[in-house]
Amino acid sequence: MIPVADLTEAEAARELERLAAEIARHDRLYHQQDAPEITDGEYDALVRRNNEIEAAFPELVRGDSPSAHVGAAPAEGFAKVTHALPMLSLGNVFSDDEAREFDQRIRRFLSLDGETTISYVAEPKIDGLSFSARYENGVYRRAATRGDGTTGEDITANLATLTDLPQRLTGDGPVPEVLEVRGEVFMTKADFRALNQRQIDAGAKPFANPRNAAAGSLRQLDPEITRSRSLSLFAYASGEVKGLEVESHHAFLERLKTWGFPVNPQTRPCQGVEDLIEATHALALQRAALDYDIDGVVYKVDRVDWQKRLGFVSRAPRWAIARKFPAERAQTTVKAIQIQVGRTGTLTPVAILEPVTVGGVVVGRATLHNEDEIARKDVRIGDMVTIQRAGDVIPQVVEVLLDQRPADSAPFVFPETCPVCGSHAVRQEGEVARRCAGGLICSAQAVERLKHFVSRDAFDIEGLGGKHIETFHNEGLITQPADIFALEAKDNEPGALQHLRSREGWGPKSAENLFKAITARKTIPLDRFIYALGIRQVGQATARLLAGHYASFAAWRKAMDEAQTEGSEAFADLQNIESIGPSVARDLVAFFGEEHNRAALDALIDAGVEVLDFARPQAAGDSPLAGKTVVFTGTLDTMSRGEAKARALALGAKVTGSVSAKTDYVVVGADAGSKEKKARELGLTVLSEAEFRAMSGG
């Protein structure tokens, strides 16, 4: 693996693309199917590498970046619940120094001096399944899983079977009008052993680890199965709350205990970062003796007013972070090396391992990243290797045990042709990835692009899963996205080879439901439409930025056509969008430069797809900053630059890094420099920090 410091921009872009696809796949396996293929440590390693590359190359941050989304979509079979407030994930740190860096980031954001002590709360990070339980006037009403952070699965009846969950809030004083309690459902080690023994006695497959057992038990369509499993829970946070004011997170946890919620007794208030670090080491020493699995410690800023000021980044709060415990290792044999082909043609090698347990998780696969990584470590089929999982990172091969290498082993030869279509696998100068040159003739790419198109964050067509896409593509029924919307018409043709309703696994009702689901998705918001196209480096966050900037499909399409010339005003405007940059801009232009892509877009519109204009957050609608382009320059006195940008974005503004005639406001602090000068030359509105604070709500 090439160190981040040695990556070229092109290599970094390719690596981020690979990581986004790999992490998304493992999110689905973990959150939807409760069947992870890698350890938490291996997953964390992938996320960590992604974040390190993004920090080094901020202009390459993708919309589908793991730093911009949480979890995976709710599975079929469960009703969907939209969270009143998103259930976000957490960033990670792995060392004492990184914990201190977290503390310093908090200080910089809040503009605190070195004498001010930050109060924290340290909570054990339970390895279970997150939930949100809603109470109205003290009565339990609904519960949901995290899902993708915005929408989860309705587990109201299932969670009610847990004896740890209060059905009604009792105790001293009034109860809130609305209280969403968030926490983790888990299975103790003793209950896990007992459950697996029952599974074995019944001739059923045992669970791989307590986390899978807890998730699988809670996510049952029959609540009685959940009731039969011994599940526990700890409460640790709030969602939507009405009618309750607390000054600190610790005070909130104490209030939860008075209402009957279990709160982890290992939770500890800490004064300053050194106290946090000491608490982490103390808990690490107790880890093995605990009767439940933990994989780290969660650090939270205690003061609620500071939490509100700190706010959130795209997928996580700024005021909390997860400290992951060190990597756990094991040794196993490489049975095979498989090459996977992604939707953009990237060939990714994967080591197929003799299954081995690492830190309580059965691992059967490990990513080998790319051709250079295999060569550097000289990984061969038949080798005995050491693998590790560190925190939430995906399993990785650490080293080859050369003294145990078979005498007849041979170096792995990376293919120069696509294993799916036979086209050349080309490696461009300066890149680490080989890519299939087959394009649309490569069924692997075509199928993966179609799967992406119907995925939950794109068109979200329920009932049209990956296996169905593969079948319909192989039969020629769906070769491009527009074909999806013609599927019912094709099925009704008199000459159809086999009507969907008469196929194995289908029936009149399921066929009708699919056609209804397809029709219902003919109307789609602009940001989801852009994301669905599968443009390189354009994930959800980037798609939302583009949609917010151009507002309508017609305006975006026109701008992309005009941006075909790099020196054009349209191209300059595109790469000036916050977080876009030249690399993403070039990929967007390249997409529209291909005739077959433009034809595919036209075919979608001709098929009746209606792309809705971008809708800004309702709260931002009345803000004087809504829809305005804002540039910050100079040093601010009462808030950090990051806090100011976050405030502007939350109020519907577009924040860019350079001043142009299209800029609405330039907010200046001390030592503003050339940007202020240019703004005044252009006759733009220049705001002081005080004026910006007044405009943004004080």
Swiss-Prot record:
This is DNA ligase. DNA ligase that catalyzes the formation of phosphodiester linkages between 5'-phosphoryl and 3'-hydroxyl groups in double-stranded DNA using NAD as a coenzyme and as the energy source for the reaction. It is essential for DNA replication and repair of damaged DNA. One of its GO terms (molecular function) is DNA ligase (NAD+) activity. Its cofactor is Mg(2+); Mn(2+). CDD domains: BRCT_DNA_ligase_like, LIGANc. SUPFAM superfamilies: BRCT domain, DNA ligase/mRNA capping enzyme, catalytic domain, Nucleic acid-binding proteins, RuvA domain 2-like. NAD(+) binds at residues 40-44, 89-90, 123, 146, 184, 300, 324. PANTHER family: CHROMOSOME TRANSMISSION FIDELITY FACTOR 18, DNA LIGASE. Zn(2+) binds at residues 418, 421, 436, 442. GO terms for biological process: DNA repair; DNA replication.
